[in-house]
């Protein structure tokens, strides 16, 4: 698993399909990208629930956009530590300060930077903490 994690790369905003995906296609896309992280698979019911709760917008003509896919990736990776209400509040703050593409790509960078430490592929350095003592 550590080998998979060290090679894991999240799709950047411009790499997410911009053709509009139906619900089943959206779920397959999400699960394919997130499988190496060992995340619980997302289901069509989960996506529909996020739409009903207003965390992501309704699909247009039953198709999910690039921005909605990026939001779903964020939700799946964040929902274990944040409530849907907090995630929705963060989305609202993000919209006030930067584009979805900027916020999502920044999130991808930070996730990729943290993964080796979370999964033990890189030793944690505490030298920066000692400097402040």
Where are the language model's segments positioned?
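Conserved small/polar residues in nucleotide/adenosyl-binding loops
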Residues: 127-133
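Basic helix-turn-helix/winged-helix DNA-binding cores
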Residues: 1-95
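Non-DNA-binding regulatory cores of transcription-related proteins
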Residues: 100-120
